[in-house]
Amino acid sequence: MTVMEHTKAAQIDLTKHGLTGVTEVLRNPSYEQLFVEETLPGLEGYEKGVVTELGSVAVDTGIFTGRSPKDKYIVKDDTTRDTMWWSDQGKNDNKPITTEVWDELKELVTTQLSGKRLFVIDGYCGANPDTRLSVRIITEVAWQAHFVKNMFIRPTDEELATFEPDFVVMNGAKTTNPNWEKQGLNSENFVAFNLTERVQIIGGTWYGGEMKKGMFAMMNYLLPLQGIASMHCSANVGEEGDVAIFFGLSGTGKTTLSTDPKRELIGDDEHGWDDDGIFNFEGGCYAKTIRLSKEAEPEIYNAIRRDALLENVTVRGDGSIDFDDGSKTENTRVSYPIHHIDNIVKPVSKAGHAQKVIFLTADAFGVLPPVSKLTPEQTKYHFLSGFTAKLAGTERGITEPTPTFSAAFGAAFLTLHPTQYAEVLVKRMEAAGAEAYLVNTGWNGTGKRISIQDTRGIIDAILDGSIDQAETKVIPMFNLEVPLALHDVDPAILDPRDTYTDPLQWESKAKDLAERFINNFDKYTDNAEGKSLVAAGPQLD
């Protein structure tokens, strides 16, 4: 076996990972090497990379254009039995498997990767050396190696020389599981984790995000048990060193609002909060590109150049990209190293404690105020609720709101009971003297969405502290404290009741939404912490 490396780091032994007969190992190859490897003329199918006019390579991930939550499994053993938030305890994707089934799945992956020419990427998940995971990703596909080189934190040559993995990811995308029915699994595809062995294995799916989000789920297990908040949020820092974090589900404005020319980006998706402050888990960004334009999102557009990797976009014959084409998927993506963004914090990916915590929601019911200041109990309640809503059009042009509740604004990646994340977050906030705000970027009684100008004015008022000087009143039913006036924000929208010609209309919609909140929160009342928070939510007399 030969080991090609861009450093003189010690050779690595893959037999300890169950891989034998490996013909060649390309360990942490340069971007230049990866570009050559992923665009080789002989490559076919999903291995083939296409060079676009922007200089970045584009790949197709086949039918898997997003994560496969129904194919996610975790070994239930002495390590996880009493700590994991299992699928039978709540509506989640943490489905248990036995060590016997794990051994069979792992055998499929090690057989697939043995005897092959392999790419090995060693990187870090977490910018804090004290708590980061040293992750080794093993794959036979060049662009998958490129993806994780972009997304994980890249070690220095000195760090590589002594690198020992805490966690190993083996991606056997080309193999599937023929015995899935007999094993009681969902399909022939699998994304499985063993916390005792500290290994993730992948079979059947080519989607790059499984590797990134897999390690996020593991950080979500390991960090809160040490009292460190693990968060699905974006983060930025102002000129005075003031840090803000933005939680929000897809479509609420998390990326748009945290990308601010007046503030430096810490990261766009996954962060921790420890005794030193906020830190990014990642070394790159994974941005949606559907309907991307240079005018609307110049930072992301300009990041798409050599070393960026596009997924599932339509590339025309001349190499130009049709970002408006969602025929493969609406979830078209690009990964790129974080240094492709100009306005990033230095040193990269770390800053002090957060002073402002912003929960973004897009309320399509037209009930919630555009901004509310939350008490610590309300902070936990709304963090656990993780509410947003979308408008789905019907054939007669009527629009019906569809609510989504996702605990901690990232339920798909939680591995402990949601109340544990809320407790750790609020403890960190209280120690730092941080304030929390609920910001609604959705609709009101006018039937229109709250303007981006008003929302930006609200965010500015939160960040500069002027919102805390404003006079306030309390909105009934939800008991939310709202300002009467804010600089650069239309005062007529601050109380949502004022946006309706008939205030009774707001009341009937508010009752409907309050009931949905109450019914959703019922699942968290299986422990004392959850029960104690019911009073912080909406109240119906």
From Swiss-Prot:
GO CC annotation, single: cytosol
Gene3D superfamilies from the UniProt entry: 3.90.228.20, Phosphoenolpyruvate Carboxykinase, domain 1, Phosphoenolpyruvate Carboxykinase, domain 2
Cross-referenced HAMAP family: PEPCK_ATP (MF_00453)
Protein name as annotated: Phosphoenolpyruvate carboxykinase (ATP)
Organism per entry: Vibrio atlanticus (strain LGP32)
Any one GO molecular function term: metal ion binding
Chain's gene name: pckA
Residues the record lists as binding ATP: 213, 232, 248-256, 297, 333, 449-450, 455
Enzyme class: lyase
Its EC number(s): 4.1.1.49
Keyword Coiled coil (UniProt): no
KW ATP-binding (keyword) present: yes
